[in-house]
UniProtKB/Swiss-Prot annotation:
One GO process term, biological-process aspect: protein targeting
Disulfide bonds: none
Gene: secD
Source organism (scientific name): Elusimicrobium minutum (strain Pei191)
Keyword Transferase: no
The protein's name: Protein translocase subunit SecD
Lipid bilayer topology: Multi-pass membrane protein
SUBUNIT field: Forms a complex with SecF. Part of the essential Sec protein translocation apparatus which comprises SecA, SecYEG and auxiliary proteins SecDF. Other proteins may also be involved.
Gene Ontology terms for molecular function: protein-transporting ATPase activity
Lineage of the species this protein comes from: Bacteria, Pseudomonadati, Elusimicrobiota, Elusimicrobia, Elusimicrobiales
Stretches that traverse the bilayer: 5-25, 316-336, 337-357, 364-384, 409-429, 436-456
Domain of life: Bacteria
Keywords linked to the UniProt accession: Cell inner membrane, Cell membrane, Membrane, Protein transport, Translocation, Transmembrane, Transmembrane helix, Transport
Family: Belongs to the SecD/SecF family. SecD subfamily.
């Protein structure tokens, strides 16, 4: 056996062992019951490199969010683009900390964001977590004056003093001094605050939930960064004796009196439930959204529908593959069996590659896999037909195989290359499901060329070392 043949088989065996290594955790994971997988996911013990199931296969919720770009300080196209990109990263950080792994989050158009939550048990909590702007501000409460007393009386006498965004209506806002704003209190009523904000949630380093706050309610403690500690120390040190309002999303959570200069730590107390406190801590750690977001579309897919999709997709795929394997073996005999071996390896290598990239398998992804397998079969058919032609011309066994691959290569390359170009455009301009199709198709085409050309040729080279008289085609 030549060194060239040995190298080819070494490459194939390394790829095969690597695929088995990558697919074994996937097999173990999906051998577990749904309850066991849910427990492992909740405890954070979910394996990292496994083949994830998408929303259409696993069930869950799909949300379409709209970023309110009109609330951006700078509403230029560049600023809007940056705001959407930052919002995607912040939402991803929030969901990751909430415990939902590998959530597909993609941009849709100029100001929309698609979020898929496969397998999540309580989508309402995740929706509240995603939609919360989490704009944390620290403002000094204005001391009581006759002008503010008059403004307060006017606000209380007005039936609808607030607009739909929770801001004071313009006719009442103009009654306030230039350096003053008024915001609602969480427990009812409103507070007059300084308009200037000197410390925000961007200055925080960490936030966590503590039990044992006021009246036994959970509270959120926070720690400032080094720069934030300087700002907060300056703010509290120069306003001892005044009230400091802790404002979250334009609502005053509490307004404790400043007893001394505070630098590093603080806490937000209120009548939080444990879930509310946990979500607040997560949003503060992940950062504030650059602008408010609202959920404009929500779709829910039940787990049973996802299981039906899996069964239907797997069944259809297996039926199609088995029929192709049988037809190839009948029509091309030994050549068909060699092609079938390459096709099976193609599927194994493709699934292993997807597991290595921690990809998410969806129904469009399954369609991409099937199409790539069809392209691989087409490549094998081209090779076998060219080999048949050379055999009819009386070529020797080696010449038949060599010329068959040489003459078929240009057609194989052209068909796969044009498909790669299409897949590239689909990935660049398509939405989430279309991108999933494009990714699996691209991987499948690359692996298909490897198995159809490299693997099958290695098998023929191995057969030639035994000096056979003929290979049935």
């Amino acid at each position: 056996m030549s060194n060239k043949v040995l190298v080819k088989w070494a490459v194939i065996l390394v790829a095969l062992f690597a695929s088995v290594y990558l697919l074994y955790p996937v097999y173990k994971w999906y051998s577990l019951s749904n309850e066991d997988r849910a427990k492992l996911e909740a405890s954070g013990d979910r394996p990292k490199n496994i083949l994830n199931l998408g929303l259409d296969l696993r069930g869950g919720s799909s949300l379409l969010l709209e970023l309110d770009v009109t609330k951006l300080p700078d509403n230029t196209p560049a600023a809007r683009n940056d705001a959407v990109s930052r919002a995607i990263e912040i939402i991803r950080n929030r969901i990751d900390q909430y415990g939902v792994a590998e959530t597909p989050i993609t941009r849709q158009g100029e100001k929309w964001i698609s979020v898929q939550l496969p397998g999540i048990a309580n989508p309402a909590q995740a929706e509240a977590l995603i939609g919360k702007t989490a704009m944390l501000e620290f403002r000094i409460v204005k001391p009581q004056t006759s002008a503010l007393d008059k403004a307060a009386a006017k606000i209380e006498d007005t039936e609808e003093p607030w607009d739909e965004d929770g801001n004071l209506i313009p006719s009442l806002a103009k009654l306030l001094p230039a350096d003053t704003i008024v915001l609602k209190n969480k427990e009812g009523g409103f507070s007059f605050l300084e308009k200037e904000v000197k410390v925000t949630g961007a200055d925080l380093e960490n936030a966590q939930v503590n039990v044992g706050g006021d009246y036994g309610y959970p509270e959120v403690s926070f720690t400032f960064s080094a720069e934030g500690a300087k700002k907060f120390g300056s703010l509290t040190g120069s306003n001892i004796g005044k009230q400091l309002a802790i404002v979250l999303d334009n609502t005053v959570q509490s307004a404790p009196s400043i007893q001394s200069r505070i630098t590093r730590d603080g806490r937000i107390s209120g009548r939080f439930t444990m879930d509310e406190a946990r979500r607040l801590a997560i949003t503060l750690r992940a950062g504030a959204l650059p602008a408010p977001v609202k959920i404009i579309e929500k779709r829910t897919i039940g787990p049973s529908l996802g299981e039906d999709s899996i069964k239907s997709g797997v069944r259809a795929s297996l039926y199609g593959i088995v029929i192709i394997l049988i037809l190839m073996a009948i029509y091309y005999k030994s050549g068909g069996i060699i092609s079938n071996i390459a096709l099976i390896l193609n599927l194994v290598f493709l699934l292993a590659a997807m597991a290595a990239f921690n990809a998410t398998l969806t129904m469009p992804g399954i369609a991409g896999i099937i199409l790539s397998l069809a392209m691989a079969i087409d490549a094998n058919v081209l090779i076998l037909e060219r080999m048949r032609e050379e055999k009819l011309r009386g070529r020797s066994l080696y010449e038949m195989i060599d010329l068959g691959y040489t003459k078929a290569w240009s057609a194989i390359f052209d068909s796969n290359f044009t498909s790669w170009i299409v897949a590239l455009f689909l990935f660049q301009f398509g939405s989430g499901p279309v991108k999933g199709f494009a990714v699996t198709l691209t991987l499948g085409l690359l692996i298909g060329v490897f198995t159809s050309v490299f693997v099958t040729r290695a098998i023929y080279d191995l057969l030639l070392t035994a000096n056979p008289k003929d290979i049935s085609l």
